[in-house]
Amino acid sequence: MNDPRSKMMISPGLLPTESLLDSLILISNEVSSMQKFPLVQIKNVSSMIRRIKLLSSLFEEIQESDSPLPPSSILCFIEIFSVITRVKVLIQECTDGSSLWSLIQLDFISNQFFVLVKEMGRALDILPLNLLNVAQDIKEQVDLLHKQSKRVELELFIDPREVQRRENLFEVMSKNCLQNKKTNNNKGFIDFVKVEEIMCSIGLRTLSDYVEEISKLEVEAQNQAGTGGLIVVSNINNLMSLVSYTKSMVFRNDGESEECKPISMFLYNKSKIHDNDSSSSSSFSQSMMTVNIPDEFRCPISLDLMRDPVIVSSGHTYDRISIAEWINSGHHTCPKSGQRLIHTALIPNYALKSLVHQWCYENNVKMNEAITKNNNSSSKRHKNENAIDHISENKASKDAVKMTAEFLVGKLATGSTDIQRQSAYEIRLLAKTGMDNRRIIAEVGAIPFLVTLLVSKDSRIQEHVVTALFNLSIYDNNKILIMAAGAIDNIVEVLEFGKTMEARENAAAAIYSLSMIDDCKVQIGASSRAIPALVGLLKEGTIIGKRDAATALFNLAVYNPNKLSIVKSGAVTLLVELLMDDKAGITDDSLAVLAVLLGCSEGLEEIKNSKSLVPLLIDLLRFGSVKGKENSITLLLGLCKEEGELVAMRLLANPRSIPSLQSLAADGSLRARRKADALLRLLNRCCSQPHHSL
């Protein structure tokens, strides 16, 4: 589609050559009588035409009355003439342009209709209806139109059905091998029934429709070459590849005497598609294509069926080949959670493997087809072809993500507030899953724009942006890029004064994620506001917010100079209070931070001054979690070493302390057993000194 803005710069102050009312009636009738509507933006087009038809009745009524027009009404009608003229141009552009490109530009075009409706409403603001010699019902209709236009100003309308079509289009493009098509018969992993449905929904039903759409995309690429930039032209070329490839598959010529048939007529007639010696790998590919794999059976890395599911130290399950490749490439974190892997052992998930086997049997999917070794050359050849197709599919998926990310970043950089809000939300979702997605989004330059928008006055933009940065930061390389973009001050700003609690909490989560890298711990700790802001959220946040703040403080406290800042911010007293609050729900996190702060003399002093802490720790030795018990015993041992007999006497005076320590020394974790033994030895030495009494 040509850029509508270039054709819509019509000055509202330029009077038509004919009389004003004649021109208004003429342009209104031209719009109302349009025969061909675009199949994208149909609701916005229909709504706009309905408004113009209603105004046309007003113009005709005024013309018939032959009464003089008040000056303010003339100004109003000049503005309306400009709006209707631009509506006509916009509808014509949508009709004549590429339907696919209109679908990709859904937000941008919807915003243009939105702007025109707002301008129509503002023009009607100055229309003196009471001074016009028209029927009462016309006045009421125009007044209703005015009120509706003012209501529309509050919210941009984007047809959810068209949003879904666009999502379906992106999904199809991610599954299509656009850049690596071969001349062989195995042309990727597309569900062509779904492709045909998408194309039909935007008006591509016949072979000529496909040919026309390709021509429109070619024209659009030429128009954008000078103004849209390489990214836009590349996106249009990708769309042309999709339509061309789909056309060749949706319409096939089975014989010289036969006409082209849509794929829905022969997709399930396998005898016409495959010859008798079709390979088993081909049937495997078809079965996988037509059967919907449950999400819980898909590997989070490859999104393929997990044929050999294994569990990593974080507790998440992956396909063995995918996670092994991930670890071997130098990563030491869980791809899904971002947690550091404490070991690289891969534990077979036999329960899930059994369920996958059962699902494969019930759905006629050959479980071991792609992994069974076979020495004959034919099987090897088909196995290699499957591997190539798999690589090609992954590349196509990455290309689709890159195209989407580039498009969204462009809207993020130049769009209106509404467009930026939608783009930030979509980047947030795109960055939520997959390390490749996070890497690609950063590579196309999203991070600097996201950092800038952290201080947006729009609460939703701020929330989406800080969450997107948190999601992106899960990929280790992005942590450096985010810090290099100067994000920390803006993130802290959101943490302190965020417009929503969710934004503040996600800012804390972002700091937690960034602080996993040692250099980032130093930079964050150097900010005079970061640690006090985290302590503030620890006090004011929800359970999730408190936990995010506590884990961020724990990470920062690992760097010794940060411990003093945490203590000075009043964290110790607050953490002890949270231990006493059953509803807070962050006992383990609070204990972990207190245990780390023992390594700082100021922290130790603050912890010693808490009179209620020791009884709490004794109770946690009995009822706490494994981690809670470990950190409780760490704190008690540290206090005993520092305070000596004073804390020892308090422990011995509590009848529950010795049984709890003995139980922990016998049945606790290795770390807890070791520290429980050390504490029992200290208490034993204290008891052996008879001159001390309880």
Curated annotation (Swiss-Prot):
Tell me which tissues or organs this protein is expressed in: Present ubiquitously at very low levels during nonsymbiotic growth. Accumulates in roots and nodules during symbiotic growth with rhizobia and mycorrhiza.
Entry PTM:
Phosphorylated by LYK3 in vitro. Phosphorylated by NORK/DMI2.
This chain's protein is named U-box domain-containing protein 1
Consequences of knocking out this gene:
Increased nodulation in plants infected by S.meliloti expressing modified inefficient Nod factors (e.g. nodF nodL) or in the mutant lyk3-4 infected by wild-type S.meliloti.
Instruction: Summarize the impact of D308N.
Output: In pub1-1; abolished E3 ubiquitin ligase activity and slight reduction of the total root length. Increased and faster fungal colonization by R.irregularis
Domain of life, source organism: Eukaryota
Q: What pathway does the annotation place this protein in? A: Protein modification; protein ubiquitination
Q: What is its EC number?
A: 2.3.2.27
Check the record and name the PANTHER family matching this protein.
U BOX DOMAIN-CONTAINING, U-BOX DOMAIN-CONTAINING PROTEIN 1
Q: Which reaction does it catalyse?
A: S-ubiquitinyl-[E2 ubiquitin-conjugating enzyme]-L-cysteine + [acceptor protein]-L-lysine = [E2 ubiquitin-conjugating enzyme]-L-cysteine + N(6)-ubiquitinyl-[acceptor protein]-L-lysine
ARM repeats mapped onto the chain: 392-432, 435-474, 476-516, 519-558, 560-599, 601-641, 646-685
Q: Which gene encodes it?
A: PUB1
